[in-house]
């Protein structure tokens, strides 16, 4: 497993990438249902998957919750092969059809989290991109294995992208109440759906003013 979270590599990448992203993403609006959990255990951000941008959107969430901690993102091995440089930014490749691949990824993450228990792990249990209004979301059970084996605080995260009155979309991110690491995939899926529905309801109420009306911080 050649992945690692290299802070110099992340800083160099983001020096160029974040300005590029700002020209293509109008804003990332984040709201939290509760203050962040204590940093004595890892965080697992379990989110729906609506776009190529989602990992970078959740990087903004991680900056707010644990800005100085490493962040690891679980990605399909096939997708990671297209962007091998992501390995230096903590991206871990997994082939869901291969128990050995899953076991190696878990072993790598457990070792890294023992070194830095305040780390964050990003996981997209759908395994592929779907629109935010899809119901059910279709979470795979692998998220249960990662949450339990990593002994993590689990945060359900709903993501929705909306163009509003700008060319570039605004990402609305709703982070729910923390859950125990023994959570079932079905319950986690329901909680993420609840967060997405809250975003969609907010957009239905506020329309093009949603970006300005969004309750940044703890709601």
Report residues per predicted region.
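Membrane-anchoring hydrophobic helices of lipid-metabolizing enzymes
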Residues: 1-59, 70-71, 81-91, 110, ...
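Structural motif
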Residues: 44-46, 93, 120-124
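Short glycine-enriched loops at secondary-structure junctions
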Residues: 51, 75-80, 159-163
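Short helix-capping segments at alpha-helix termini
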Residues: 64-67
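Generic beta-sheet signal
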Residues: 74-76, 94-96, 157
């Amino acid at each position: 497993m050649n992945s690692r979270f290299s802070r110099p590599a992340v800083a160099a990448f983001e020096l160029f990438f974040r300005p590029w992203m700002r020209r293509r993403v109008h804003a990332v609006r984040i709201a939290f249902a509760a203050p962040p959990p204590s940093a004595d255990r890892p965080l697992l951000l379990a989110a729906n998957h609506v776009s190529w941008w989602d990992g970078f959107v959740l990087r903004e969430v991680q900056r707010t919750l644990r800005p100085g901690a490493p962040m690891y993102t679980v990605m399909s091995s096939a997708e990671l092969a297209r962007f091998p440089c992501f390995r230096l930014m903590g991206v871990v490749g997994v082939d869901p059809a291969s128990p050995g691949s899953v076991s190696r990824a878990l072993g790598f993450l457990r070792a890294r989290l023992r070194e830095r228990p305040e780390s964050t792990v990003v996981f997209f249990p759908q395994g592929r991109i779907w629109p935010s209004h899809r119901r059910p979301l279709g979470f795979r059970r692998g998220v249960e294995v990662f949450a339990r084996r990593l002994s993590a605080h689990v945060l359900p995260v709903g993501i929705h992208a909306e163009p509003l009155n700008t060319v570039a979309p605004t990402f609305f991110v709703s982070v729910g109440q923390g859950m125990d690491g023994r959570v079932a995939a079905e319950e986690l899926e329901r909680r993420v759906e609840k967060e997405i529905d809250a975003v969609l309801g907010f957009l239905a109420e506020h329309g093009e003013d949603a970006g300005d009306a969004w309750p940044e911080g703890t709601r």
